[in-house]
């Protein structure tokens, strides 16, 4: 399709021996007391990941691809262990354990990112968080300040030191939490879901320096060329404002045909050219 290749370095804090949840969203540990048992399976050295990156660089010119590094965020990681429902109770029932988990994650993320930075400079680094849904954040600003912010503040300077930028990957409407992120040094967000009510131009007016990736409403892609074009028209002022990479907000839906996707790509290239004129 002529798109820029992307190489993603996914730094997983769960080692191969970490127990799998019995179903999606279920706990990986039967109870908080079991954390001592599973902790030795966490925070692996990820040596194969680093070896794969070195091999890729041996066979590819660095300027020929986008390098994207991903670390677990400090809302997301405890949820992977506690399970979705139990995680929300844990903020109140097990705050000390939450901090212990996130302190360990922060140390692991910093070490892994330093290793990546010694091999190559990522174009950007995302915190996998998913802290929002279509009505905004799933935690209060106070909870963010207590359980998430201190650990972002530890990791972001390392991201800066290796020459990259920190971006928060969160589903839903992140608008309310952008000031929270900015004060940690996190400089952008993705995928800025249009279906969740995100308004990119409103974000740009309130946060002129905020980096944005995504925000193209994927739900119009099977509605014909005019609908696809109209969505690019909506985004053109944001594209011209800078610090914005338009892309499908999440994956292209399965109902989009190959021909419809080609129309999307043709118009993406056209509007990218219009952006600089």
What are these regions (language model features)?
Residues 2-49, 59-68:
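A contiguous, low-structure linker/loop signature
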Residues 39-277:
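Active-site loop segments of alpha/beta catalytic cores
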């Amino acid at each position: 399709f002529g798109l820029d290749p992307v190489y993603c370095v996914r730094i997983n804090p769960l080692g191969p021996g970490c127990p799998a949840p019995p179903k999606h969203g279920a706990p990986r540990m039967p109870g908080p007391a079991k954390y001592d048992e599973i902790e030795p399976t966490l925070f692996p050295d990820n040596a194969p990941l680093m070896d794969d990156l070195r091999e890729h660089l041996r066979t590819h010119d660095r300027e020929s691809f986008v390098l994207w590094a991903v670390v677990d965020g400090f809302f997301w990681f405890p949820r992977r262990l506690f399970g979705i429902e139990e995680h929300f109770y844990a903020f109140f029932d097990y705050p000390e354990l939450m901090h212990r988990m996130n302190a360990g994650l922060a140390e692991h993320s910093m070490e892994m990112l330093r290793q990546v930075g010694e091999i190559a400079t990522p174009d950007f680094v995302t915190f996998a968080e998913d802290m929002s849904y279509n009505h905004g954040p799933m935690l209060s600003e106070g909870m963010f300040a207590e359980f998430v912010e201190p650990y972002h503040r530890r990791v972001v300077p390392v991201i800066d030191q290796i020459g990259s930028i920190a971006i928060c990957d969160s589903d839903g409407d992140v608008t309310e939490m952008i000031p929270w992120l900015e004060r940690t040094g996190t400089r952008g967000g993705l995928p800025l879901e249009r279906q969740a009510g995100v308004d990119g131009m409103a974000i740009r007016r309130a946060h002129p320096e905020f980096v944005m990736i995504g925000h193209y409403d994927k739900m119009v892609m099977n509605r014909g060329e005019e609908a696809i074009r109209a969505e690019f028209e909506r985004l053109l002022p944001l594209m011209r404002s800078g610090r914005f990479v338009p892309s499908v907000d999440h994956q292209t839906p399965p109902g989009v045909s190959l021909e419809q996707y080609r129309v999307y790509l043709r118009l993406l290239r056209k509007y990218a050219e219009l952006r600089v004129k």
